[in-house]
Amino acid sequence: MILLLDVGNTRIKWRVVQAAGTPAMAEGALGHAEVHGLQAIVAGFPALRRMVGSNVAGASLGAALDGMLTTAGIAGRWVQAARDEHGVRNGYDRPAQLGTDRWAALIGARRLHGGPCLVVSAGTATTVDHLDADGQFQGGLILPGIDLMRQSLASNTSGLRLEDGHVTPHPRNTADAIESGCAMAQAGAVERMFAQLVPQEDALCVLTGGAAPRFADLLSVRTHPVPNLVLDGLAVIAAADAADSCPPHPTGTRAWPGDGRIR
């Protein structure tokens, strides 16, 4: 049984699978302040033996998670961006500097869609990454997420109160103006990047992240929403790890330890 962890800037998303390549048995999310709640989740799945995760929240939280996993007898692996892995080639000037969440999302998108795509992850920050038809990561954008944009206005503008607003074509109050402006800024960045993929007919915009629904309806491009793309990418990595750990069989297939069967 395998635990997948996407440790982001605000939340920890988790998924439990029976084995690599199988559907989710359970999944959910915790805030950073709720990190110790992961102990109860792990305790509910006593057969857990492995963890594959992405952590962009820093060493302190990673160390706390490592301690919990060690206590539970779970072997953990935090992924790192590579130069070429799982059908994706890393075009970053320094491949190791690419965020592990972006790397896992690119791998998940490649498995989902074999053609050219934009991988848009909207959370605390928004990333807009271009993956071409050959699996080459061509680069991407990082911009403040909607809530960071809103908070920046509130922190740096005198007399401005943050109130819930709605996205409208022609806002006529401050709350709607802020929400609409921030959402349209996100959509504009996505569409500007997507224009570089045109006229490739099979180009797709893969949307993920908790803030994506706040601007998805503004997009005029072909989109495909995915709730937890980083976890999907981690599942691909976990499956490859499992395959690599199986000893070769004389027939050329791989023998999976534990049951003697050839798969």
UniProtKB/Swiss-Prot annotation:
Pfam families according to UniProt: Pan_kinase (PF03309)
Predominant location: cytoplasm
Enzyme class: transferase
Cofactors, names only: NH4(+); K(+)
InterPro entries: ATPase_NBD, Type_III_PanK
Gene Ontology BP terms: coenzyme A biosynthetic process
Keyword RNA-binding: no
Keyword tags: ATP-binding, Coenzyme A biosynthesis, Cytoplasm, Kinase, Nucleotide-binding, Potassium, Transferase
One GO CC term on file: cytoplasm
Annotated metabolic or biological route of this protein: Cofactor biosynthesis; coenzyme A biosynthesis; CoA from (R)-pantothenate: step 1/5
Chain sites annotated for binding ATP: 6-13, 124
Active site: 101
Protein location: Cytoplasm
Cofactor: binding details: A monovalent cation. Ammonium or potassium.
Gene Ontology molecular functions: ATP binding; pantothenate kinase activity
Amino acids binding substrate: 92, 99-102, 174
E.C. code: 2.7.1.33
Catalytic activity: (R)-pantothenate + ATP = (R)-4'-phosphopantothenate + ADP + H(+)
Self-association and partners: Homodimer.
NCBIfam families: baf
Summary of the function given for this chain in its UniProt record: Catalyzes the phosphorylation of pantothenate (Pan), the first step in CoA biosynthesis.
Family: Belongs to the type III pantothenate kinase family.
Protein name: Type III pantothenate kinase
